[in-house]
Amino acid sequence: MVKETELIFIPVPSTGHILVHIEFAKRLINLDHRIHTITILNLSSPSSPHASVFARSLIASQPKIRLHDLPPIQDPPPFDLYQRAPEAYIVKLIKKNTPLIKDAVSSIVASRRGGSDSVQVAGLVLDLFCNSLVKDVGNELNLPSYIYLTCNARYLGMMKYIPDRHRKIASEFDLSSGDEELPVPGFINAIPTKFMPPGLFNKEAYEAYVELAPRFADAKGILVNSFTELEPHPFDYFSHLEKFPPVYPVGPILSLKDRASPNEEAVDRDQIVGWLDDQPESSVVFLCFGSRGSVDEPQVKEIARALELVGCRFLWSIRTSGDVETNPNDVLPEGFMGRVAGRGLVCGWAPQVEVLAHKAIGGFVSHCGWNSTLESLWFGVPVATWPMYAEQQLNAFTLVKELGLAVDLRMDYVSSRGGLVTCDEIARAVRSLMDGGDEKRKKVKEMADAARKALMDGGSSSLATARFIAELFEDGSSC
């Protein structure tokens, strides 16, 4: 009987994915003392040159979490592939790294088997984009493999839909059919095609999805960063699905400590928090589009005009398009800061978690990244949806149409090729968010309470995580 165990986590080299992998690792270690060590395999990629430094900063005070850096491969996929089809880039990166990953896992397993302690490697926890490793590493080394879905359960429903659709239509999605409604499993409503992830409309990225989607069925189990109370419909769907692995709702998995931007100084944080301290409760709208979300100068000017028109208090984190770091004030309309003096603050980086937790924040104009979505729900802050990339349109559709927890600003922003969102559109959404959303605000607050209860002893996510841990040790006892 195995008394203690080790897990090996394999995230893709992206800060958002690394963050939630490490947060989940911390939770597992805190929940069960029999989990002796969790090793994070850190892949090297030109697309995320600071991934290792970032990961080390997250585990600095965690002696039971180890980082195992893999050496850079000699022939990474071309970087222009990452820029035009990031899903295809990541899938190719994992394939090229597979021999290194297999060697590293083999070495860890061998060291445990040859050691004097009773610790054994119980399994692999793989990022959704690493699911080829279920067969190529897990099965080869006789290790149970679990896929960790860093997005929501409806995304898993989309992955279930793709192979069925591909058998009928063996090509990428077509934007000219944007209003065609798709019967995606796990959704209450049929989804207009235009709200699907933009990669599905790109031939190279679509081929990556077609590779990834069927492999979920090969896993021992699927861990989802969501919770039953937020997504009862898809979790119920998967619980009744035959010939499919068990799905564990283990979220929300959050980091409630802010990660500073490399260029951020303490004075920026102090200025932002100090300004918020002086604002009335729930009076400020926060605009922030994530680490990769940016807008061009004409769009900045439309947002500025809308904020002037609405007249509400605001905190606006600006990242402009382009390779050169721009001072936010350089792209604002002339005289804007003078006209909004006292009721608006513009910054580059913002401490998002601390901002969303602040009593002054009454609404969040967001890109709808899943980490940001969970943070806003955790702190009971309603959202206006402005998706920018990846699966964010699907998240926006979920929040607005499926759950009634958000205001639609422009749910199909990516599908509409980033066309200019007008001052009037933005103003309408901000007004609805700040002035007309009492019922929505109440629903979001109720979901914040549900998120906390899910993580308590006896809560839905706590019980699901316990089932996952029990399965690990059951497998380990038969090794």
From Swiss-Prot:
Record keywords: Glycosyltransferase, Transferase
PROSITE patterns to which the protein is assigned, alphabetical: UDPGT
Catalytic activity: a flavonol + UDP-alpha-D-glucose = a flavonol 3-O-beta-D-glucoside + UDP + H(+); a 7-O-hydroxy-flavonol + UDP-alpha-D-glucose = a flavonol 7-O-beta-D-glucoside + UDP + H(+)
Record Pfam families: UDPGT
Top-level EC class: transferase
Record-listed E.C. numbers: 2.4.1.91, 2.4.1.237
Record-stated family: Belongs to the UDP-glycosyltransferase family.
Job of this protein: Possesses quercetin 3-O-glucosyltransferase and 7-O-glucosyltransferase activities in vitro. Also active in vitro on benzoates and benzoate derivatives.
Protein name per the record: Flavonol 3-O-glucosyltransferase UGT71C4
Taxonomy of the source species: Eukaryota, Viridiplantae, Streptophyta, Embryophyta, Tracheophyta
